[in-house]
Amino acid sequence: MLRRSLMARIAGCLAIALAACPARAAEPGRDAEPAGKGRFPDFGFLPQGYAGRIFKLSQDYPAAPPDRAAIPRFFGLDFRGDWVEGYLRTGWKSYMQELRRYCFEGNVEADWRVEENGVRRWYHMPWQHYGPIGREGIRGMTKEAEVKKYQLASTQTFSGGQTYAVAYYNEFAAYTIGKVWKDHEHPDLRGAEFPRGSVICKLLFVDVPTEQVPSLVDPILWQGYICDNFASNNRSVRPLALIQMDVMVRDDRTPTGWLFGTYQYNGMMKRPNRWDNLVPVGVQWGNDEDNRRDHYHTRCPERTEIVATIRESVINEDRDELPATHLGWNGRLNGPVDNPRSSCMSCHATAQYPIKSEMAPFFERNPPSPGDERWMRWFKNYKCTSKGGGPFDEGSHPADFCIQLVQGIDNFHRWWDERGGIFASEYGAQGTLERPQPTRDRPETDRSERNDLGLQPKPLSDAPRDRPATKPRP
Ligand code: HEC
């Protein structure tokens, strides 16, 4: 393999992959500006002859940090509201309500063509277009995970469903993207420090027959250029239904510096503006690092099980509002298309490059037992970069909880690697190659070998972005 042989020949360049490589000297001919240089590609897939509106990557990232006055108003609210341990109340919902309003403002009106938001700018993460699960060209959605039979409701007998998603970054968060990707050929994670005020919002859509899921009545449908099913790479333009909206907020008041929240679509609310049918599932401000006694189960969701011993997530207890859903491990926050043995924070805390650990313990080649010392490494309150947090593994660089940042850099390096060929000028005086090198230190493993939870083997050989799918047990 090219990657391996290059690695062998130029061992030692690994450490300089994170932009420490000196810029190449300009050379006549070779460094002529290719068309569009300075712009990142917008998407990876669009059918021949498609005449509808297409996705544009919002990529004019702010060069300076935004003014503090632009910090969203909901930062003044207490995200816990009047929540007290063992006694759930609804105060936290005001925070979620305001946070939702902020994400919607101007974006709903612009039909989520966020570069046209008339109130404030929002942006996208570059380098999500590459590879078989990369961005499609209608909405910019990437292929994420499989939706298992019974995952969304006991009536959902359809299998082979899939999730597609697209994330949007406010100007605080986008400033960080711009810093990391300032040099388009040398992404530099040393700039990965999201400032207070950063908000990232992600819409998730499913390809399942909506009539099988009561909460997907009166759905919000988007057309996407999507695969026939999760296992397929053959695409066509088809509708998907909104199921979930995820948010990440950089707020100094939480133990880690990040707050996670999610909303689930419930068409039974029959709200006049269908976007308002996104009801809050909950908020997670910590990872409950002491909660380790495993009482996980993935029954097909007939009721939402709120676990009283979880202290750093609050979950919506209004059963009329929130459709029955599974949560994360031991009741930590997770959404309907997330893995029940994980949590928002536990996956996101692994964001680092080189990628040295899996996003969840059960994906490790030699998985730990639920609740043991090694398992609990995924359930700690790691700090964000501004609070002095380091990488999940020694010798890596933290990406400040942002997984798309990691995947973008990984995709970039794959592309660089796969295009093959070496420029003579890339060889320095010592015979070392001065270019970004693949930096996946962990061996490539066959994901089917790690299939400990009855999770389906991944059909795509290169699917780092996939969220593990849940397997509800009927
Ligand atoms: C199993 C791991 C996993 C879990 C659990 C998980 N995520 Fe993510 N998340 C990902 C991956 C992988 C991506 C990047 C893929 C993409 O969006 O294209 C991502 C992307 C995101 C993004 C876009 C910014 C970023 O970091 O890339 C947001 C916002 C987000 N997730 C929020 C949440 C919230 C809120 C929850 C819990 C309700 C959650 N996530 C649970 C794996 C996970």
Language model features with spans:
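Bacterial N-terminal signal peptides that target proteins for export
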Residues: M1-A11
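Sec/Tat signal peptide C-region and signal peptidase I cleavage site
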Residues: C21-A25
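Ubiquitous "structural anchor" signal
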Residues: A19-A20, I355
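Bacterial N-terminal signal peptides
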Residues: R9-A19
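Conserved small-residue
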Residues: A26-S346, A351-P474
